[in-house]
């Protein structure tokens, strides 16, 4: 008895691929570099990190927890898109959109991080200012003081750009760090970038993590030579 082998048509193959792309993994739908949760998506906008997971609902009791693995140099750009007009403020503020966010970042570089900064931008290179409606919970006490499990000093800035700077701590290669904060906006469906500056505020000799040269000290010595 002969059995006829049925090969999938191109149309069938496309349907199968689309099906697997639509299958949720964990609590969010996942594609390469993009994770979608109800009402919001998180996606890669730079090639120097891996977006590993995103969970939660964005409330104070159940914050979004985004896990990343940074392996390259330069700024880390995470794109955030609130696509549901009914998303609302999930942190009990008067903003059109608001959510609590925890970022877990794994240091897979060869550098010691003595400094970490988070900044909001509408477009890459165009920082969020005081009047554009995008902020780290501007004029709100939600989740404040912002905090980290590895940095003890936090600078919460609103002017001229929305920036949170974390210092007085360190994250060695292979270690992870957690940041807790909030993001708000006055529009219903904003799309923006969370920019992460991972370069420490000093120069290093070779790759020795024990002998940093602070830039402030270098500038002071140069001024004395003038």
What positions do the PLM features span?
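N-terminal secretory signal peptides that target proteins for export/translocation
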Residues: 1-8
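Short, intrinsically disordered, low-complexity terminal segments
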Residues: 8-10, 26-29
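Bacterial N-terminal signal peptides
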Residues: 12-24
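Short loop/turn positions at the edges of beta-strands in beta-sheet-rich folds
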Residues: 25, 107-109
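Membrane engagement elements in two modes
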Residues: 30-100, 110, 121-127, 131, ...
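Buried hydrophobic-core signal for structured, non-transmembrane domains
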Residues: 103-105
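Short acidic/proline- and small/hydrophobic-mixed sequence motifs that coincide with surface turns
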Residues: 111-115
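An exposed acidic His-Trp-rich patch
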Residues: 116-151
């Amino acid at each position: 008895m002969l059995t006829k082998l049925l090969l999938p048509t191109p149309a069938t193959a496309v349907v199968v691929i689309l099906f697997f792309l639509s299958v949720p993994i964990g609590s969010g739908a996942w594609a390469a570099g993009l994770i979608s949760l109800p009402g919001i998506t998180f996606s890669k906008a730079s090639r120097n990190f891996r977006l590993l997971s995103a969970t939660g609902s964005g409330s104070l009791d159940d914050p979004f927890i985004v896990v990343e693995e940074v392996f390259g140099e330069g700024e880390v750009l995470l794109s955030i898109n609130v696509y549901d007009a009914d998303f609302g403020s999930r942190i009990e503020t008067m903003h059109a959109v608001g959510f609590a966010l925890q970022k877990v970042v794994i240091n897979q570089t060869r550098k010691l991080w003595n400094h970490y900064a988070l900044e909001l931008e509408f477009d890459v290179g165009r920082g969020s200012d005081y009047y554009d409606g995008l902020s780290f919970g501007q004029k709100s006490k939600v989740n404040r003081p912002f905090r980290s499990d590895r940095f003890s000093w936090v600078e919460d800035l609103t002017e001229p750009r929305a920036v949170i700077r974390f210092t007085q701590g360190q994250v060695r290669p292979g270690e992870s760090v957690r940041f807790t904060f909030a993001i708000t906006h006055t529009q219903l469906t904003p799309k923006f970038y969370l920019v992460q500056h991972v370069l420490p505020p000093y120069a290093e000799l070779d790759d020795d993590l024990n002998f940093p040269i602070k830039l402030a000290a270098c500038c002071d010595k140069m001024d004395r030579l003038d």
